[in-house]
From Swiss-Prot:
Its main location: membrane. It holds the Pfam family Herpes_UL43. It is found in: Membrane. Belongs to the alphaherpesvirinae HHV-1 UL43 family. This is Membrane protein UL43 homolog. It comes from the Viruses. Keywords: Membrane, Transmembrane, Transmembrane helix.
Amino acid sequence: MAVNGERAVHDENLGVLDRELIRAQSIQGCVGNPQECNSCAITSASRLFLVGLQASVITSGLILQYHVCEAAVNATIMGLIVVSGLWPTSVKFLRTLAKLGRCLQTVVVLGFAVLWAVGCPISRDLPFVELLGISISAITGTVAAVHIHYYNFVTTFNGPHIYFYVMMLGTGLGGLLTVILYMYVSKYEVLIGLCISIVTLVSIVDAATDLQDTCIYRKNRHKQLNTYTDLGFAVVYTQNDRGRVCDHRESSRTLKRVFKGIRIMSVIPPVLYIVTPLMWAISHIIKLNHFIKLTQVTLAVSIGGHIIAFGLQGFAVLYQEKKNLWVIVLYTTTSVTGIAVTFAGISWGAIIILTSTVAAGLTCIQMMRLSVKPIDCFMASHITKVYHVCVYIIINLCYLCGTYVS
């Protein structure tokens, strides 16, 4: 009895120590237990909501660029956004870029609000100097917003499943609702007011850092990696066949090792990201899509791609062993079909390809997260964050192709 009593006291003390180690440092009322902590639950919900709103800011920036920049400039900036996100960086650097981005996007949106208030038209018809200044401001705001999302994405990708899936759903809804408002709200006063409010909300709070500080996030990292360290600093120790102890740091994993076994699935999104705008442009050059209303079609395709991706994700979880195979077969087949239909002179080929690309990009991101080891998640998130942004960039590029080519 004495031994059991001592063991119970030891377990209780261990639990107290765990609570202290995972207790949030900046969230008042945190009790150090995810199942009992209402403060961290409320913080998580509010910060994930802001993560979704950040996608609305990115979409607004892309719409603004469309109105003030030429197609070549738009395409170039989108390419730079992608390239700037490919290089793996430390969490500290991501946080610094996000902090700078929040300041820049606030300054940009307030500047455009002042221009609108004084009656300055925002279009390509302005004198060169004024147009150049407005274009640079629009580009700066968009790039800043994307780098905030990069930090948000890396944070949620390495967090609990619920954080990741809410982020994926929230960013999709944020972008789609912004396009819907742009299409159907005729009063610019309403749009500008919403834009200022949203940018202010997402800029005054560091959503990603707050999410990392919740006891929910800290407990999940301890469960996955057996560590209480912050994101990017985990070290996992293993023993090889020779009995030698090896340390694996999440910040220094190689991409070759991270994507071992899922190489084909990691290649599908970038291939489709390259092929899709080309097919969309070709279909407009040969006048296959002359009857299509571009804004409505790209919106419908975006919604359809998201529905397919999230619907099939549930199906994939039921069949874990063959998940990689069916993803590869499904999206390869639909993409090849779309290409064949396009060259056959049928008008809906490009739409099939774009829908497949949106769904494939989102699905592959989710499948890669399920496939990589916990220690590899941090490095994998640096690539998948670019895949995620590329989904929305490709939609925008296809819209530009249809606008300027037709």
